[in-house]
Amino acid sequence: AGGELVRFTTQGSREAENMKNINAGIRADGYQTPLVADVHFNPNVADVAALYCEKVRVNPGNYVDPARKFIKQEYTDEEYAHELQKIEDRFVPFLNICKEHHTAIRIGVNHGSLSDRIRNRYGDTPEGIVESCLEFLRICKKENFHDVVISIKSSNTVVMVRSMRLLVEEMEKEGMNYPLHLGVTEAGEGEDGRIKSAVGIGALLADGIGDTVRVSLSEEPAAEIPVARHLVDYIGKKKGHLLIPAAACPSFDWLRPTRRETVAVGNIGGNNVPVVISNRINGESTICENKDATPDYIYIGGKMPKQFVPGQSYIVDYNVYETLNSKPETTGAKLYPIFPAMAMPLIASIKADVKFLTLQFGTPAEEYIACLKAHPEVVVICVSNHQNRLGDQRALVHEMMNAGLKNPV
């Protein structure tokens, strides 16, 4: 199927011992794919698996700490330190086995299996997830064991992304630089599972975070590989792109991003939910049979559609806006002009409650900033033909934030 690692769930000692036979069997068949044993609850199983696999995954939430029972218990600092020492006393012998057999490990934290100890001190939070991981990483660093990969997984993509970003920041503070494994737990099946995986994994890959990827679908394992490959290939196409000379807005919090403050222009921006614009400049019908799939706005360029739908909002090129707006066929429909950057001087000459302006990062900043400050009724359509389109679009938004602009994008 194209996977570069194969993970086996290893429930007990019998399964761990059988990894020896599995390893020998696939090597005899000529396969050199590394094997990963996924171990929960029993550190003794991890010890055995480390003898026969290239990597062993352990879960900090249940490696030494008992399975969580949602018991509330306050720990003094002394008691908490004692619990950490218990982890170290058990984890170090495992690291020694891994050193002897050149076995890598993955410290894999699951949002759903944080220990009661962590939850009682940090809550069910990204901070608790990250601390659960760092407790084990600090031992690895202390023991000079660096064949480590880290994963933080959750079925909640917001928690997953924020936790992984926070982990990267905390590792930098502590002088750590371990590779990161990305995945969304139980993403689901079909289109929903693929979208959820893309949201979580794709957001982090776009940040430059992530070294290995696993897509978790409720389907046959082989179906997961093409999805993961597509995500990796998509990001790989941006490799070596031209520098984007941008300056991040100082008020932007990378770990806790909030919605950018904007003014309301019609039903766009302010406290409104994001709108959907459909591009139909090639003459596609603007009539939607499925009312639930009707876009908020339809862009038709400079062409007359076969029929204007009463009540529907249309975006039309600025140079035909006044002509189309005066035609009887448009009665009942709502038309709004869109301007390219080169037509900014004409924005003031056309009357409309909502106007659209296409901008790309690199447009002379002084020119468009002055225009947008003078015309709060303008909504920016952020476009890009850069190899790293997302980075280019982020750069424009940060440039606007640095200028204090509140026009919707």
Regions found by a protein language model. Give the residues of each.
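Glycine-rich, proline-tolerant flexible connector loops at the mouths of alpha/beta enzymes
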Residues: 3-26, 60-82, 148-157, 299-310, ...
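Hydrophobic faces of well-ordered beta-strands that scaffold small-molecule active sites
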Residues: 4-8, 33-39, 56-58, 105-109, ...
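N-terminal active-site wall of soluble small-molecule enzyme domains
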Residues: 10-52, 284-286, 307-308, 321-331, ...
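Alpha-helix-loop-beta-strand connector modules within alpha/beta enzyme cores
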Residues: 14-37, 86-102, 131, 135, ...
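N-terminal small/glycine-rich loop or linker at the start of catalytic domains
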Residues: 19-20, 102-121, 267-283
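Acidic (Asp/Glu)-rich catalytic clusters
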Residues: 23-28, 48-53, 95-102, 141-142, ...
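Hydrophobic or amphipathic alpha-helical targeting/insertion segments
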Residues: 31-72, 77-97, 102
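Catalytic alpha/beta core domains of metabolic enzymes, predominantly
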Residues: 77-88, 96, 119-269, 351-354, ...
